[in-house]
Amino acid sequence: MQAAELGSTKAPRRNLRKATGVVAGAIALFLIGGAGLLRSTGVDADAPTTAPAPEALVRSALAGDDIDAAIAALQDRLRANPEDAESLTSLGLAEVQRARATADPTAYPRADQALRSAARLERAAGAPTYQTLIGLGALSLARHDFSDALRYGRRAAVRNPYDGDVFGVIGDAQIELGRYDDAFATFQRMVDTEPGVAAYSRVSYARELQGETRGAIQAMTAAETAAGSPADAAWAAFHVGELRFRDGDVAGAARDYRRSQGLDPSYVPARAGLARVAFARGDLNKAIAGYEEVVARYPAAEHVIWLSELLDLAGRSEEAGQQRDVVRAIQQLLAANGVNVDLEIALYEADHGDRTEALRAARSEWDRRHSVYVADAMAWALHANGDDRAALAFSQRALHLGTRDALLRYHAGMIRLALGDRAGAVRDLTTALRINPNFSALHAPIAQRTVARLGGAV
């Protein structure tokens, strides 16, 4: 993946020198969702010490050790020296990791306080360090404040343009803002600077957005091969499975999910993947049981939504309603802790009842950014409110990169049907089902019934 080679999966030569320490290296974890991406800087992480350095504590936590213990140790250091900016930065990073690892957003304000305190102390001594700026960028990404993330990333790049992590912050922000050409160029620079799990996974996403599923799988497989720990490999293997599942390859996805689970039995998303495989194979009870276990261990909204829709499909409407209440409570908790959830609210409320709130949230998010998925949310919210002419324009914009996403095609088909374009509706709905006939427990059955009613064939 040398310059201008996003279409290649050949491992590149490392042509720029790494110039940062361990704390900066931690950021790759937060940006791709892995579990141990810290690079060695020549220090033996296993060597006994009486007072571990802040970055060593973060490295230990991110490599799979007790994140709570790492945070407690950093807090002890800060009680002894409240103006230890390096420990504050490390504490902020560890709190972001705790939020991600536990689906508990109450850690984000603590991360914010620690990182801003570090920046204030560093500013008094001259300027915030590269590590702190990258940490603030990672926190902004986690809270879906992509404009701020881009700002912090660019400031960090001025201080150190030789580290791959800074291009992760910048590129992730650009892609979420809908600045695709800029993002793809940034990801290429990341690959050229520091090839590895974080860089290859971004290449995979860039290819997926452009409808290149095979290339996306190749790049994510390269990420798995490059993984430096079982936890990183489990993360990448799971995402290979996600790519296959979204492309309708249930058997291949099942193999990848099981491989992920074997690499790291504690990795909950692999269990969610296997629950979706059970749904795809028609075992609704097994799918529900799988998601109940997932939600008990990791109550992220996406998992609770799947559980609620599976329960509805099984005719267990009262239990499904209880899970929908949980989804709204999660969204409220996220918002209360500084996470922007307008995109999620727009799609969820368009599906489950509050059409006015869906459109408010979609418009609010569109004012902030113009990604294909925000365009899709605008389309679906407008459709829910009966404005299908406007919805179609947004739906077409959502598809302009050529993304092979069954849900985007389903939305397009239902909008065309509402406009009386039966042929167009059949075309889009059939395409959705050919991409992935199991894309949603709620919408896939509707798509199948609608195509049959309109006389189409999948």
Go through each PLM region and give its residues.
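N-terminal leader/linker segments that initiate helical-solenoid repeat arrays
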Residues: 3-131, 437-438, 445, 451-456
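Short coil turns that delineate tetratricopeptide repeat
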Residues: 82, 123-127, 161, 194-195, ...
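Register position in tetratricopeptide repeats
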Residues: 97, 142, 176, 209-210, ...
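TPR alpha-solenoid repeat register
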Residues: 87, 128, 132, 166, ...
